[in-house]
């Protein structure tokens, strides 16, 4: 393990912070400030796993020191051999734990614990691209439900032949962004479309964007930059459909962003939803601009969030999903049904390896 003294110093600092937060939670005056209490609870929870791992590491190191003393003092060859075997086992456990702690000490993305807006846009391929966008939407809904997250349709633009020209899902739950952020990019499908009469394989694409939730204070929006029109909602619904103007179309003039919302029951709710989506999109643009400035000299292979980055190909003929960032293949029929945890964990592991390599370069 590199720089053990530095690691211990960092862990001691984290432990002190954790203990301070624990003490603050016991302050009765905190009950009158629920927002501050929630902030402290979240901060403490974010440190808990690291503190527990550090405590375990200290106990194992103490055991190892005791066994080393036993090996030095023991006169009986058989007992010394048993102690040496125990020492070897402890060394292996400590090494594994140090690897785990190293990962825990890697800088965290400040957005990792946030909920997200997941946007899917049909790309090249016409009707088939829109149908594929619908397939991806179902894949993410099933994955989210399997994770225990909640999913709500925020905005949609259905296509005539099925699927969507564009669809936005609001996904809420524990550490949603930390997993879904690796899904951002271009997804490509190779298959025979339902509209194809001669059995030829077509290639189509859809683009996925993962945008973390933002508070109003995070993004300033000038009301004069917004143009809002209302229309009657279309599609299935109750008596209000096509009679009351509940649908909202919002245009943000400086960025050219268009948002159409009709999923909520009232015009006021749809306007609030459109503003929420606009804030998320503007924040995403700001974050990507900052990321490009910081990483202009060195492009990460995993998790750049670049909209133009081709990340996967879904080949139906061979029942194969290829992740181009990882150069790995996965089974398509299970992945498209929402079983993508293995794909996501592989991307997370690759990103962590990159972080470790970068850390080694910077400290070398």
Curated annotation (Swiss-Prot):
GO cellular component, one term: cytoplasm
GO terms of molecular function: translation release factor activity, codon specific
Coiled coil: none
Post-translational modification: Methylated by PrmC. Methylation increases the termination efficiency of RF1.
Keywords for the protein's UniProt record, in alphabetical order: Cytoplasm, Methylation, Protein biosynthesis
Subcellular location: Cytoplasm
Domain of life: Bacteria
InterPro entries: PCRF (IPR005139), Pep_chain_release_fac_I (IPR000352), Pep_chain_release_fac_I_sf (IPR045853), Prokaryotic/Mito_RF (IPR050057), RF-1 (IPR004373)
Record PTM N5-methylglutamine, positions in chain: 239
Disulfide bonds: none
Gene3D superfamilies, per the entry: 3.30.160.20, 3.30.70.1660, 6.10.140.1950
Known function: Peptide chain release factor 1 directs the termination of translation in response to the peptide chain termination codons UAG and UAA.
Family: Belongs to the prokaryotic/mitochondrial release factor family.
HAMAP family in the record: Rel_fac_1
Name of the molecule in the record: Peptide chain release factor 1
Organism of origin: Gloeobacter violaceus (strain ATCC 29082 / PCC 7421)
């Amino acid at each position: 393990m590199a720089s053990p003294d530095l690691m211990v110093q960092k862990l001691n600092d984290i432990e002190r912070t954790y203990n301070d937060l624990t003490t603050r939670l016991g302050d009765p005056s905190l009950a009158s400030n629920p927002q501050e209490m929630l902030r402290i609870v979240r901060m403490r929870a974010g440190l808990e796993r690291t503190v527990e791992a550090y405590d375990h590491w200290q106990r194992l190191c103490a055991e190892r020191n005791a066994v080393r003393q036993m090996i030095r003092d023991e006169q009986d060859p058989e007992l010394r051999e048993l102690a040496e075997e125990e020492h070897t086992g402890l060394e292996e456990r400590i090494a594994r734990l140090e690897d785990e702690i190293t990962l825990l000490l890697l800088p965290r993305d400040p957005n990792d614990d946030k909920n997200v807006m997941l946007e899917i846009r049909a790309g090249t391929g016409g009707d088939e691209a829109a149908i594929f966008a619908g397939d991806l939407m179902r894949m993410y809904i099933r994955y989210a439900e399997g994770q225990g997250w909640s999913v709500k349709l925020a905005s949609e633009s259905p296509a005539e032949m099925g699927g969507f020209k564009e669809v936005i899902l609001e996904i809420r739950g524990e550490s949603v962004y930390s997993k879904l952020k690796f899904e951002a990019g271009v997804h490509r499908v190779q298959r025979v479309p339902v509209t194809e009469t001669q059995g030829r394989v077509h290639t189509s694409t859809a683009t996925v964007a993962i945008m973390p939730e933002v508070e109003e204070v995070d993004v300033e929006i000038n009301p004069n930059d917004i143009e809002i029109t209302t229309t009657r909602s279309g599609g299935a619904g109750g008596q209000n459909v096509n009679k009351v103007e509940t649908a909202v179309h919002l245009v943000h003039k400086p960025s050219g962003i268009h948002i159409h919302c009709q999923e909520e029951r009232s015009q006021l709710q749809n306007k609030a939803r459109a503003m929420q989506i606009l804030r998320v999109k503007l924040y995403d643009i700001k974050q990507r601009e900052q990321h490009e400035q910081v990483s202009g000299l060195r492009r990460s292979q995993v998790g750049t969030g670049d909209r133009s980055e081709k990340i996967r190909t879904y080949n139906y003929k061979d029942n194969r999903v290829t992740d181009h960032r990882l150069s790995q293949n996965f089974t398509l029929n299970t992945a498209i049904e929402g079983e993508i945890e293995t794909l996501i964990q592989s991307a997370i592991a690759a990103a962590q390896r990159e972080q470790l390599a970068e850390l080694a370069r910077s400290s070398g």
